[in-house]
Amino acid sequence: MTDPSTSSRTGHASLPESPFIDRLGAQLLSAADGVSEVVLPLQRDHMNTWDVAHGGVTMTLADVALAMAARSLAGDGVGVVTVEMKVNFMQPGRGELRATGRVLHRSTTMAYCEGEIRDSEGHFVAKALGTFKYMRRLAVGRDITRQRLRSDPAAKPGPSD
């Protein structure tokens, strides 16, 4: 995801541009003050072999909701990346999935979040916990070496690189 727009942090629904999330069809209803709500009307492409929401779709929706809750507390130009996430699946999701996210605790660099997903009947589909790191958008892949300043350009990357 890219940096959040001003409108998403002031309560107007707008997800940051992300080709994967755009294709999924998730819609941000709100994200402000550490709380978010995201919906996904399930389509045939979202289903598993039993004709219910695929677990990966459910996990992605949880990730988006938790990340948007965390991002709603960030300043301009700051986004989040998922450090870890755990999802417990309670029952199959059908119809429209609605995910809520909430920041439990925020430090200078991290946000600890929780969320839940319910279906259009109000059934409890999943519970999620996640940790997110605040950061400015960085170059990735091959471009990252241009971003880092090393005293020895031939030095091998360390464990945190």
Predicted regions and their residues:
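Terminal targeting signals and extreme-terminal segments of soluble enzymes
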Residues: 1-161
